[in-house]
Amino acid sequence: MLKKIKISLILALGLTSLQAFGQENPDVKIEKLKDNLYVYTTYNTFNGTKYAANAVYLVTDKGVVVIDCPWGEDKFKSFTDEIYKKHGKKVIINIATHSHDDRAGGLEYFGKIGAKTYSTKMTDSILAKENKPRAQYTFDNNKSFKVGKSEFQVYYPGKGHTADNVVVWFPKEKVLVGGCIIKSADSKDLGYIGEAYVNDWTQSVHNIQQKFSGAQYVVAGHDDWKDQTSIQHTLDLISEYQQKQKASN
């Protein structure tokens, strides 16, 4: 127990060095995570409860790469305005990590402002069936990107929160963007599972653990992302859900 407390304290102290930006903007909270990588957080309401949605953007020598989007189209312009105000650069690439609005909802907007937009073919198929705006470019489940001097990788670990959820790995920064397949450490349950594959979720998380064991930071898709026990907590939540399901049958 003391060991766990000590580890949590070390992580908390390390994260206090994060530089906060955009506090004056009520639509988006931006925090510098590492080097040129920033976490942005927006807020929306689901089933009467307010939640935070987290994603990241990377400032490169060519422009800004945005993973996912603010949660709610009313925040799109203020978000990109804030980026330009802080960095003097425009968004040149947007990548959606699955088909839900808090991830793919900005594809049309980013395309209109001149950014190249990307999703997996699986996400594109879902968006097409739902008659929603789609990315300009699609790729198979895994893809490596090189933008100027920066590199990162999109990886499909398997089904979990949705059939199409992917994660994004920044090797230089050792940062993993878990998206919604990774639950925050303060999550009480698995959240929305209307499109989830709970029986596949555990193996998918194990795939993430094995492939990115060197991650220094894991950014969960919602709520608290600074507590770095989110991967194990996700596994615990899946196990709890499965046990309850067995007990009720």
UniProtKB/Swiss-Prot annotation:
Catalytic activity: a beta-lactam + H2O = a substituted beta-amino acid
Top-rank taxon, per record: Bacteria
Positions that bind substrate: K183
Keywords from the named record: Antibiotic resistance, Hydrolase, Metal-binding, Periplasm, Signal, Zinc
Residues annotated to bind Zn(2+) 2: D102, C180, H222
Keyword Nucleotide-binding recorded: no
E.C. code: 3.5.2.6
Database matches in PROSITE patterns: BETA_LACTAMASE_B_1, BETA_LACTAMASE_B_2
Subcellular location: Periplasm
Annotated family: Belongs to the metallo-beta-lactamase superfamily. Class-B beta-lactamase family.
Known function: Confers resistance to the different beta-lactams antibiotics (penicillin, cephalosporin and carbapenem) via the hydrolysis of the beta-lactam ring.
Name of the protein described by the UniProt record: Metallo-beta-lactamase type 2
Species, as recorded: Elizabethkingia meningoseptica (Chryseobacterium meningosepticum)
